[in-house]
Swiss-Prot record:
Pfam families in the record: Ribosomal_S19
Transmembrane segments: none
GO MF annotations, alphabetized: RNA binding; structural constituent of ribosome
Superkingdom per UniProt: Eukaryota
Keywords from the named record: Ribonucleoprotein, Ribosomal protein
GO cellular component, one term: cytosolic small ribosomal subunit
Protein name listed in UniProt: Small ribosomal subunit protein uS19
SS bonds (residue pairs): none
UniProt keyword annotation of Protease present: no
Amino acid sequence: MADEYNAEEAAELKKKRTFRKFSYRGVDLDALLDLTSDELRDVVHARARRKINRGLKRRPMGLIKKLRKAKQEAKPNEKPDLVKTHLRDMIVVPEMIGSVVGIYSGKEFNQVEIKPEMVGHYLGEFSISYKPVKHGRPGIGATHSSRFIPLK
């Protein structure tokens, strides 16, 4: 068996990489992009389903219209222009995939490119609104033993 090894075949196998095909809850990406809002509602989780049932109001629809316009105006094989929004409670729908959104964190707009893995999540999940705590040394009065730490 060892003498049947062919270097050309091994190189060809290495070139032919297989990527994991994306699916959201058992629905392929191509089929996901073709879903209507009613069909999408049946696929997403309960919290998103409830939000979709209540209807997309003026502001979320306005964001989707801006994203459509940005995608339409973009040149082929290029990212669309940034669309800024304060709508952190907007659920990512398949139509938004490939768009670039500036999500407001309360201080600044964080630029995020929407990927297929983000479908069903809220926009706010991708723009952190607080600065994570970096724990340093305890201050004076933090514990009883800190009374014996000499002052600098």
